Amino acid sequence: MNALACLAEAFAWLIRPGIRRFILLPLAVNITLFAAGSYAAFHYSDALVESLLPGWLAWLHWLLYPLLAVALLILTYYSFSLMANLIAAPFNSLLAAAVEKAERGDPSPPATPLWRDILMSLIQELHKLLYFLALALPTLILALILPPFAPVLWFLYTAWCAALQYLDYPMANNAVPFHAQRARLRQNRADTLACGGAISLLTTIPVLNLVAMPVGVIAATLYWCRHLRQP
């Protein structure tokens, strides 16, 4: 798939001249928050999983416990990823702009005040967060009603949200409204879910999760430039 090819290529961009300087601060944010996420996941997951298992399914405890544990682990890491993206949003937008400039060879866009970039990035992140929370509610209800399908439901949720999270940076830089972003990604649903799912899985792999954020931004920008951006 096109998006997965861009994701694989994104790792090489981490050391590309002109790109590295935009990665250092988001990388520091990622390391700090994923350390906190790992601590929370491994110290509180058992009690939470036990509380989510209904008594009438006790006979399936051996099967449902590992499934819910995996779903909770993915959700925990993705929650901390959202926090990291909120904090690093202005710098991720700069990284996306630098990658797009290098990929397309365009001249630099007109400079805007840093405070304005930070403010607009934070507003956009809050907008996305509200959308993600609104989408999480029906997903949670379905997961509670159908516990055996909870891991699949949460994986689809995190894949869609991760794709929106990272593709927003290059698309917002090109003044594509959030509702138009969602419409465009629905037209490329398979590629979108594959990319988002791969990035979500990347956040759960030790060591690789430390570079998941910049890799996700770079991959999303390459995918935007090569396959989504209209001439």
Protein language model features and the residues they cover:
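Helix-coil boundary and N-terminal low-complexity module in membrane systems
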Residues: 1-136, 140, 178, 187-192, ...
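Selective recognition of hydrophobic, aromatic-rich stretches within alpha-helical transmembrane segments
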Residues: 65-100, 143-173, 207-231
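Alpha-helical transmembrane segments
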Residues: 170-183
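Hydrophobic alpha-helical segments
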Residues: 184, 188, 204, 226-230
